Amino acid sequence: TRNPDFEYREVKKATHTRVVDRQQYMDRLYGFWLGECIANWTGLITEMDKIGNIGDIKTGAFYTRQNWGQPDQPSIWGQGVPSALSPTIGYVFAAPDSTWGSDDDTDIEYIYQWLLLQNKTSVLSGTQIRDGWLSHIRHEEENFLWVANQRAFDLMLQGMVPPATGDPANNPEWEMIDAQLTTEIFGLFAPTRPDMALKMAELPIATVARNNSAWISRFYVSMYALASLADTMLQPADQLMWMAENAKSCLPDTSYAHKMYDFVKRMYLSGYSWEQARDSVYDRYQVKQLDGYRLTSRKLYCNGCFAGGINFASSLVSLFYGKGDIKETIKIGALCGWDSDNPTATWGGLLGFMIGKKGIEKAFNRTFSEKYNIHRTRTGFPNNGIDTFWNMALHGVWVTDRVVQDELHGSIDLQENKWYIPVE
Protein backbone atom coordinates (compact mmCIF):
# COMPACT_ATOMS: atom_id res chain seq x y z
CA THR A 1 0.00 0.00 0.00
CA ARG A 2 2.67 2.48 -1.09
CA ASN A 3 1.69 5.80 -2.58
CA PRO A 4 3.35 5.66 -6.05
CA ASP A 5 3.66 9.47 -6.07
CA PHE A 6 5.62 9.67 -2.83
CA GLU A 7 9.21 8.92 -1.90
CA TYR A 8 9.37 6.92 1.33
CA ARG A 9 12.56 7.59 3.28
CA GLU A 10 14.56 5.24 5.46
CA VAL A 11 12.97 4.45 8.82
CA LYS A 12 14.38 6.38 11.77
CA LYS A 13 12.87 5.31 15.09
CA ALA A 14 13.55 8.37 17.19
CA THR A 15 12.78 8.73 20.88
CA HIS A 16 9.73 10.73 21.94
CA THR A 17 7.53 9.28 19.22
CA ARG A 18 4.10 7.73 19.32
CA VAL A 19 3.46 4.58 17.30
CA VAL A 20 0.26 4.40 15.24
CA ASP A 21 -0.72 1.19 13.41
CA ARG A 22 -1.07 2.15 9.75
CA GLN A 23 -3.17 -0.87 8.75
CA GLN A 24 -5.59 -0.38 11.63
CA TYR A 25 -5.76 3.30 10.73
CA MET A 26 -7.04 2.38 7.28
CA ASP A 27 -9.89 0.42 8.88
CA ARG A 28 -10.64 3.41 11.09
CA LEU A 29 -10.70 5.77 8.09
CA TYR A 30 -13.18 3.39 6.45
CA GLY A 31 -15.21 3.69 9.65
CA PHE A 32 -15.05 7.48 9.38
CA TRP A 33 -16.59 7.51 5.89
CA LEU A 34 -19.19 4.85 6.70
CA GLY A 35 -20.19 6.41 10.02
CA GLU A 36 -20.41 9.85 8.45
CA CYS A 37 -22.66 8.57 5.64
CA ILE A 38 -25.04 6.71 7.98
CA ALA A 39 -25.31 9.76 10.24
CA ASN A 40 -25.55 12.27 7.39
CA TRP A 41 -28.40 10.46 5.65
CA THR A 42 -30.22 9.75 8.92
CA GLY A 43 -30.00 13.43 9.86
CA LEU A 44 -31.31 14.50 6.46
CA ILE A 45 -34.74 13.09 7.32
CA THR A 46 -35.19 15.67 10.09
CA GLU A 47 -33.03 18.50 8.69
CA MET A 48 -34.82 21.83 9.29
CA ASP A 49 -37.99 20.16 10.57
CA LYS A 50 -37.66 21.95 13.91
CA ILE A 51 -36.11 25.42 14.26
CA GLY A 52 -38.25 27.00 17.00
CA ASN A 53 -41.01 29.59 16.89
CA ILE A 54 -39.37 32.96 16.27
CA GLY A 55 -39.93 35.08 13.16
CA ASP A 56 -41.86 34.24 10.01
CA ILE A 57 -41.27 30.48 10.13
CA LYS A 58 -42.60 28.59 13.16
CA THR A 59 -42.22 24.82 13.50
CA GLY A 60 -44.00 24.04 16.79
CA ALA A 61 -42.61 21.86 19.55
CA PHE A 62 -39.18 20.32 19.08
CA TYR A 63 -38.84 16.56 18.60
CA THR A 64 -38.25 14.30 21.62
CA ARG A 65 -37.16 10.67 21.95
CA GLN A 66 -40.84 9.72 21.51
CA ASN A 67 -40.65 10.85 17.88
CA TRP A 68 -38.05 8.21 16.94
CA GLY A 69 -39.75 5.66 14.68
CA GLN A 70 -42.75 7.97 14.28
CA PRO A 71 -43.85 9.90 11.17
CA ASP A 72 -41.46 12.56 9.92
CA GLN A 73 -42.85 16.09 9.92
CA PRO A 74 -42.25 18.50 7.02
CA SER A 75 -39.14 20.66 6.95
CA ILE A 76 -39.32 24.44 6.59
CA TRP A 77 -39.00 24.12 2.81
CA GLY A 78 -40.95 20.85 2.49
CA GLN A 79 -44.23 22.53 1.44
CA GLY A 80 -46.08 20.40 3.95
CA VAL A 81 -44.53 17.14 2.71
CA PRO A 82 -42.40 14.84 4.94
CA SER A 83 -38.92 13.75 3.88
CA ALA A 84 -38.71 11.86 0.59
CA LEU A 85 -35.97 9.76 2.22
CA SER A 86 -38.26 8.10 4.74
CA PRO A 87 -41.85 8.55 5.95
CA THR A 88 -40.65 7.82 9.49
CA ILE A 89 -37.74 9.10 11.58
CA GLY A 90 -35.06 6.40 11.83
CA TYR A 91 -31.66 5.26 10.61
CA VAL A 92 -30.92 5.37 6.88
CA PHE A 93 -28.74 2.61 5.45
CA ALA A 94 -27.37 1.79 2.01
CA ALA A 95 -27.63 -1.98 1.59
CA PRO A 96 -24.49 -3.91 0.50
CA ASP A 97 -25.67 -4.07 -3.13
CA SER A 98 -26.41 -0.33 -3.37
CA THR A 99 -24.36 2.90 -3.31
CA TRP A 100 -24.10 5.74 -0.80
CA GLY A 101 -24.72 9.15 -2.32
CA SER A 102 -22.47 12.08 -1.49
CA ASP A 103 -23.90 15.12 0.28
CA ASP A 104 -22.48 18.45 1.38
CA ASP A 105 -21.41 16.90 4.71
CA THR A 106 -18.99 14.52 2.98
CA ASP A 107 -18.25 15.83 -0.50
CA ILE A 108 -16.05 18.87 0.23
CA GLU A 109 -13.95 16.70 2.55
CA TYR A 110 -13.65 14.22 -0.33
CA ILE A 111 -12.48 17.09 -2.57
CA TYR A 112 -9.89 18.25 -0.02
CA GLN A 113 -8.45 14.73 0.33
CA TRP A 114 -8.26 14.49 -3.46
CA LEU A 115 -6.58 17.91 -3.75
CA LEU A 116 -3.94 17.04 -1.14
CA LEU A 117 -3.03 13.94 -3.18
CA GLN A 118 -3.16 15.60 -6.59
CA ASN A 119 -1.08 18.58 -5.48
CA LYS A 120 1.36 16.35 -3.53
CA THR A 121 1.15 18.64 -0.53
CA SER A 122 -0.02 18.66 3.08
CA VAL A 123 -1.03 22.32 3.20
CA LEU A 124 -3.22 23.58 0.38
CA SER A 125 -2.74 27.10 -0.97
CA GLY A 126 -5.61 29.49 -1.65
CA THR A 127 -5.15 29.01 -5.40
CA GLN A 128 -5.21 25.21 -5.05
CA ILE A 129 -8.44 25.43 -3.04
CA ARG A 130 -10.04 27.79 -5.56
CA ASP A 131 -8.98 25.67 -8.55
CA GLY A 132 -10.24 22.54 -6.80
CA TRP A 133 -13.62 24.03 -6.01
CA LEU A 134 -14.04 25.35 -9.55
CA SER A 135 -13.06 21.97 -11.03
CA HIS A 136 -15.31 19.78 -8.91
CA ILE A 137 -18.35 21.89 -7.99
CA ARG A 138 -21.04 22.44 -10.62
CA HIS A 139 -21.23 26.06 -11.68
CA GLU A 140 -25.01 25.98 -12.14
CA GLU A 141 -27.77 25.07 -9.65
CA GLU A 142 -28.51 22.52 -8.17
CA ASN A 143 -24.91 22.53 -6.97
CA PHE A 144 -25.48 21.47 -3.34
CA LEU A 145 -23.89 24.56 -1.81
CA TRP A 146 -25.56 26.83 0.68
CA VAL A 147 -24.95 30.08 2.58
CA ALA A 148 -21.21 30.71 3.21
CA ASN A 149 -20.01 27.99 0.81
CA GLN A 150 -22.21 29.29 -2.01
CA ARG A 151 -21.09 32.87 -1.41
CA ALA A 152 -17.41 31.82 -1.34
CA PHE A 153 -17.93 29.87 -4.58
CA ASP A 154 -19.53 32.89 -6.28
CA LEU A 155 -16.52 34.97 -5.21
CA MET A 156 -14.13 32.32 -6.58
CA LEU A 157 -15.97 32.46 -9.92
CA GLN A 158 -15.26 36.21 -9.92
CA GLY A 159 -11.55 35.49 -9.41
CA MET A 160 -11.25 35.90 -5.64
CA VAL A 161 -8.86 33.54 -3.82
CA PRO A 162 -9.17 32.19 -0.24
CA PRO A 163 -8.90 33.41 2.48
CA ALA A 164 -10.53 36.58 1.06
CA THR A 165 -13.61 34.46 0.21
CA GLY A 166 -14.36 34.04 3.92
CA ASP A 167 -13.68 37.63 4.96
CA PRO A 168 -16.83 39.23 6.45
CA ALA A 169 -16.25 42.23 4.17
CA ASN A 170 -16.79 39.92 1.18
CA ASN A 171 -18.88 37.06 2.59
CA PRO A 172 -21.86 38.15 4.73
CA GLU A 173 -22.61 34.47 5.48
CA TRP A 174 -19.32 33.94 7.37
CA GLU A 175 -21.10 33.07 10.66
CA MET A 176 -22.98 30.15 9.16
CA ILE A 177 -22.17 26.46 9.69
CA ASP A 178 -20.29 25.72 6.46
CA ALA A 179 -16.69 25.31 7.67
CA GLN A 180 -17.82 22.88 10.37
CA LEU A 181 -18.95 20.28 7.86
CA THR A 182 -16.13 20.61 5.32
CA THR A 183 -12.93 20.47 7.39
CA GLU A 184 -13.14 17.88 10.21
CA ILE A 185 -11.24 15.37 8.06
CA PHE A 186 -8.00 17.35 8.46
CA GLY A 187 -7.90 16.07 12.04
CA LEU A 188 -7.54 12.53 10.69
CA PHE A 189 -4.55 13.45 8.51
CA ALA A 190 -2.48 14.39 11.59
CA PRO A 191 -3.12 11.61 14.13
CA THR A 192 -2.15 12.56 17.72
CA ARG A 193 -1.11 16.05 16.51
CA PRO A 194 -3.95 18.59 16.62
CA ASP A 195 -1.37 21.37 16.17
CA MET A 196 -0.55 20.05 12.69
CA ALA A 197 -4.20 19.31 11.88
CA LEU A 198 -5.09 22.93 12.64
CA LYS A 199 -2.26 24.16 10.41
CA MET A 200 -3.62 22.04 7.55
CA ALA A 201 -7.22 23.15 8.16
CA GLU A 202 -6.51 26.84 8.71
CA LEU A 203 -6.99 28.01 5.13
CA PRO A 204 -9.87 25.63 4.28
CA ILE A 205 -11.68 26.99 7.36
CA ALA A 206 -10.84 30.60 6.47
CA THR A 207 -12.20 29.98 2.97
CA VAL A 208 -15.72 30.43 4.39
CA ALA A 209 -15.54 31.32 8.11
CA ARG A 210 -14.16 33.73 10.70
CA ASN A 211 -14.24 34.15 14.49
CA ASN A 212 -16.82 31.92 16.25
CA SER A 213 -17.69 29.87 13.16
CA ALA A 214 -13.97 29.31 12.55
CA TRP A 215 -13.17 28.55 16.21
CA ILE A 216 -15.99 25.98 16.31
CA SER A 217 -14.55 24.34 13.19
CA ARG A 218 -11.12 24.23 14.83
CA PHE A 219 -12.75 22.51 17.82
CA TYR A 220 -14.05 19.74 15.57
CA VAL A 221 -10.71 19.35 13.75
CA SER A 222 -8.96 19.04 17.13
CA MET A 223 -11.47 16.43 18.33
CA TYR A 224 -10.70 14.33 15.25
CA ALA A 225 -6.91 14.58 15.73
CA LEU A 226 -7.19 13.83 19.45
CA ALA A 227 -9.17 10.64 18.77
CA SER A 228 -5.83 8.90 18.10
CA LEU A 229 -4.52 10.00 21.50
CA ALA A 230 -7.50 9.07 23.67
CA ASP A 231 -6.93 6.36 26.30
CA THR A 232 -8.79 3.32 24.95
CA MET A 233 -8.88 1.84 28.46
CA LEU A 234 -11.42 4.54 29.36
CA GLN A 235 -15.14 4.28 28.64
CA PRO A 236 -16.08 5.93 25.31
CA ALA A 237 -17.91 8.74 27.15
CA ASP A 238 -14.78 9.50 29.17
CA GLN A 239 -12.57 9.41 26.07
CA LEU A 240 -14.84 11.93 24.37
CA MET A 241 -14.95 14.20 27.42
CA TRP A 242 -11.15 14.18 27.56
CA MET A 243 -10.98 15.01 23.84
CA ALA A 244 -13.57 17.78 24.15
CA GLU A 245 -11.90 19.36 27.18
CA ASN A 246 -8.62 19.49 25.25
CA ALA A 247 -10.23 20.74 22.04
CA LYS A 248 -11.96 23.49 24.02
CA SER A 249 -8.67 25.41 23.94
CA CYS A 250 -9.67 26.37 20.37
CA LEU A 251 -12.56 28.44 21.76
CA PRO A 252 -11.48 31.83 23.22
CA ASP A 253 -12.76 32.35 26.78
CA THR A 254 -14.89 35.35 25.83
CA SER A 255 -16.46 33.76 22.74
CA TYR A 256 -20.08 32.65 22.64
CA ALA A 257 -18.80 29.28 21.41
CA HIS A 258 -16.83 28.76 24.65
CA LYS A 259 -19.84 29.80 26.75
CA MET A 260 -22.10 27.44 24.80
CA TYR A 261 -19.70 24.59 25.52
CA ASP A 262 -19.71 25.35 29.26
CA PHE A 263 -23.50 25.70 29.33
CA VAL A 264 -24.30 22.40 27.58
CA LYS A 265 -21.68 20.55 29.61
CA ARG A 266 -23.19 21.98 32.80
CA MET A 267 -26.69 20.83 31.77
CA TYR A 268 -25.32 17.35 31.05
CA LEU A 269 -23.43 17.02 34.33
CA SER A 270 -26.44 18.35 36.28
CA GLY A 271 -28.54 15.37 35.21
CA TYR A 272 -31.04 17.08 32.92
CA SER A 273 -32.43 15.04 30.01
CA TRP A 274 -31.10 15.75 26.54
CA GLU A 275 -34.46 17.24 25.60
CA GLN A 276 -34.24 19.66 28.54
CA ALA A 277 -30.70 20.59 27.51
CA ARG A 278 -31.77 21.21 23.90
CA ASP A 279 -34.82 23.24 24.96
CA SER A 280 -32.56 25.29 27.24
CA VAL A 281 -30.16 25.90 24.34
CA TYR A 282 -33.05 27.24 22.27
CA ASP A 283 -34.32 29.43 25.11
CA ARG A 284 -30.89 30.75 26.10
CA TYR A 285 -29.47 31.48 22.65
CA GLN A 286 -32.40 32.14 20.32
CA VAL A 287 -35.10 33.44 22.67
CA LYS A 288 -32.98 35.33 25.24
CA GLN A 289 -29.84 35.90 23.11
CA LEU A 290 -27.46 35.39 26.04
CA ASP A 291 -23.66 34.95 26.08
CA GLY A 292 -23.24 37.38 23.19
CA TYR A 293 -25.19 35.23 20.71
CA ARG A 294 -27.24 37.97 19.04
CA LEU A 295 -28.36 36.40 15.77
CA THR A 296 -32.11 36.54 16.49
CA SER A 297 -32.03 40.35 16.56
CA ARG A 298 -30.67 40.33 12.99
CA LYS A 299 -33.94 38.84 11.70
CA LEU A 300 -32.20 36.40 9.36
CA TYR A 301 -34.03 33.86 7.19
CA CYS A 302 -35.30 30.99 9.41
CA ASN A 303 -33.82 32.87 12.38
CA GLY A 304 -30.30 31.80 11.47
CA CYS A 305 -31.13 28.09 11.45
CA PHE A 306 -27.92 27.45 9.45
CA ALA A 307 -25.75 29.39 11.90
CA GLY A 308 -22.55 27.90 13.26
CA GLY A 309 -23.39 28.83 16.85
CA ILE A 310 -26.82 27.29 17.42
CA ASN A 311 -25.83 24.12 15.56
CA PHE A 312 -22.62 23.87 17.62
CA ALA A 313 -24.62 24.05 20.85
CA SER A 314 -27.00 21.43 19.45
CA SER A 315 -24.07 19.19 18.47
CA LEU A 316 -22.74 19.27 22.04
CA VAL A 317 -26.07 17.90 23.27
CA SER A 318 -25.70 14.79 21.10
CA LEU A 319 -21.97 14.54 21.87
CA PHE A 320 -22.35 14.53 25.66
CA TYR A 321 -25.66 12.68 25.95
CA GLY A 322 -24.72 10.10 23.29
CA LYS A 323 -21.84 9.01 25.56
CA GLY A 324 -19.83 7.55 22.71
CA ASP A 325 -22.59 5.19 21.54
CA ILE A 326 -22.78 5.75 17.79
CA LYS A 327 -26.45 4.76 17.47
CA GLU A 328 -27.61 6.90 20.40
CA THR A 329 -25.50 9.88 19.32
CA ILE A 330 -26.94 9.82 15.79
CA LYS A 331 -30.46 9.39 17.18
CA ILE A 332 -30.19 12.36 19.56
CA GLY A 333 -28.49 14.46 16.88
CA ALA A 334 -31.26 13.75 14.38
CA LEU A 335 -33.95 14.68 16.91
CA CYS A 336 -32.21 17.79 18.30
CA GLY A 337 -33.40 20.14 15.57
CA TRP A 338 -32.03 22.84 13.26
CA ASP A 339 -29.51 21.64 10.64
CA SER A 340 -29.62 18.14 12.07
CA ASP A 341 -27.65 16.33 9.37
CA ASN A 342 -24.52 18.33 10.21
CA PRO A 343 -23.89 17.50 13.89
CA THR A 344 -24.90 13.89 13.19
CA ALA A 345 -22.41 13.64 10.31
CA THR A 346 -19.62 15.17 12.41
CA TRP A 347 -20.10 12.77 15.33
CA GLY A 348 -21.00 9.79 13.13
CA GLY A 349 -17.67 10.30 11.37
CA LEU A 350 -15.72 10.71 14.60
CA LEU A 351 -17.31 7.73 16.36
CA GLY A 352 -17.09 5.67 13.17
CA PHE A 353 -13.36 6.40 13.12
CA MET A 354 -12.99 5.47 16.78
CA ILE A 355 -14.70 2.07 16.43
CA GLY A 356 -13.79 1.31 12.79
CA LYS A 357 -15.72 -0.58 10.12
CA LYS A 358 -16.24 -3.70 12.24
CA GLY A 359 -17.34 -1.67 15.25
CA ILE A 360 -20.04 0.02 13.18
CA GLU A 361 -21.25 -3.30 11.76
CA LYS A 362 -21.40 -4.71 15.27
CA ALA A 363 -23.29 -1.68 16.64
CA PHE A 364 -25.95 -1.87 13.93
CA ASN A 365 -25.80 -5.68 13.61
CA ARG A 366 -25.63 -5.55 9.82
CA THR A 367 -23.36 -4.86 6.85
CA PHE A 368 -23.48 -1.87 4.54
CA SER A 369 -22.58 -0.77 1.05
CA GLU A 370 -18.93 0.20 0.62
CA LYS A 371 -19.58 2.14 -2.61
CA TYR A 372 -19.79 5.93 -2.70
CA ASN A 373 -21.00 8.14 -5.55
CA ILE A 374 -19.27 11.54 -5.33
CA HIS A 375 -21.00 12.60 -8.56
CA ARG A 376 -24.38 12.79 -6.84
CA THR A 377 -23.30 16.27 -5.74
CA ARG A 378 -19.87 16.96 -7.30
CA THR A 379 -18.20 16.46 -10.67
CA GLY A 380 -14.94 15.74 -12.50
CA PHE A 381 -13.71 12.59 -10.72
CA PRO A 382 -12.47 9.29 -12.22
CA ASN A 383 -14.69 6.23 -12.76
CA ASN A 384 -17.74 8.48 -13.24
CA GLY A 385 -17.57 9.35 -9.55
CA ILE A 386 -18.00 5.81 -8.19
CA ASP A 387 -15.50 5.12 -5.40
CA THR A 388 -15.24 2.73 -2.44
CA PHE A 389 -14.65 3.40 1.24
CA TRP A 390 -11.56 1.16 1.11
CA ASN A 391 -10.05 3.23 -1.68
CA MET A 392 -10.99 6.48 0.09
CA ALA A 393 -9.39 5.13 3.29
CA LEU A 394 -6.22 4.17 1.40
CA HIS A 395 -6.02 7.67 -0.04
CA GLY A 396 -6.39 9.03 3.49
CA VAL A 397 -3.46 6.87 4.61
CA TRP A 398 -1.38 8.23 1.73
CA VAL A 399 -2.18 11.83 2.70
CA THR A 400 -1.19 10.96 6.27
CA ASP A 401 2.08 9.37 5.05
CA ARG A 402 3.16 12.72 3.63
CA VAL A 403 2.14 14.59 6.79
CA VAL A 404 4.00 12.16 9.08
CA GLN A 405 7.23 12.15 7.07
CA ASP A 406 7.46 15.64 5.54
CA GLU A 407 5.64 17.85 8.04
CA LEU A 408 6.09 16.09 11.38
CA HIS A 409 9.52 14.59 10.53
CA GLY A 410 8.40 11.18 11.70
CA SER A 411 8.96 7.79 10.06
CA ILE A 412 6.91 5.30 8.08
CA ASP A 413 7.79 1.62 8.56
CA LEU A 414 6.18 -0.13 5.58
CA GLN A 415 7.39 -3.57 6.75
CA GLU A 416 5.60 -3.33 10.08
CA ASN A 417 2.96 -0.95 8.67
CA LYS A 418 3.46 1.62 11.43
CA TRP A 419 3.89 5.36 11.73
CA TYR A 420 6.36 6.83 14.20
CA ILE A 421 4.98 10.27 15.00
CA PRO A 422 7.03 12.71 17.09
CA VAL A 423 5.46 14.11 20.22
CA GLU A 424 5.05 17.89 19.94
Each predicted region: which residue ranges?
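Flexible propeptides and autoinhibitory/regulatory segments associated with cysteine proteases
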Residues: 2-63
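Active-site cavity-forming subdomains of large catalytic enzyme subunits
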Residues: 95-104, 108, 113-217
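Catalytic phosphate/nucleotide-handling subdomain of diverse soluble enzymes
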Residues: 38, 42-44, 48-73, 209-212, ...
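Accessory "access/gating" subregions that flank catalytic or transport cores
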Residues: 6-22, 152-176, 183-193, 202-207, ...
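Active-site-surrounding "flap" and adjacent substrate/cofactor-binding loops of secreted or lumenal enzymes
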Residues: 45-93, 106-108, 130, 140-141
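Mature, well-folded catalytic/scaffold domains that follow N-terminal targeting or propeptide regions
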Residues: 25-30, 38, 156-168, 172-180, ...
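N-terminal leader/propeptide and maturation segments of large enzyme subunits in energy/redox metabolism
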Residues: 86-95, 100-102, 106, 112-141, ...
